[in-house]
Amino acid sequence: MSDSRAEDEAAIQAVLVDSYKAWEAGDADGMVADYTADATAIMPGSLRESRDVVRENMALAFEGPLKDSSTYNKRLSLRFVGRDAAIVVSESGILFAGQTDVPDTGKVNATWVFEKRDGQWLIAGYHNSPVLAPGQ
């Protein structure tokens, strides 16, 4: 990997870490700070069509069912698509208040789409889908 790609990979990882830390703090503004204005987020049963909509939904969730939660994230891959785009695939899950492990039934495969704008890596899209339990 070239030095510039290594720097890009580190910058993308930093964006993800910042988003995870903001989630743990219940900070919806911080969680979407590195989202593009036109970012989309798709999760089972929902489509959120902008950074503002994602922020609004997360703020409500952090006051309710996601209060005091954090996330489990294991990066499975990162690949670049041209000079200014990248895709990260991870296994993720929500650790609800008091949980120390995410049960297999709570894990998702997540896809993060990154775009480099004005030299900064930003999240342009997010999608997740439940991980099938063994034997399914």
Language-model segment annotations:
Residues 1-10, 135-136:
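Basic/polar N-terminal segments that are highly enriched at the extreme N-terminus
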Residues 48, 94-95, 129-131:
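Solvent-exposed loop/turn segments at secondary-structure junctions
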Residues 89-97:
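Generic short beta-strand segments
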Residues 19, 26-27:
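Short helix-adjacent coil turns
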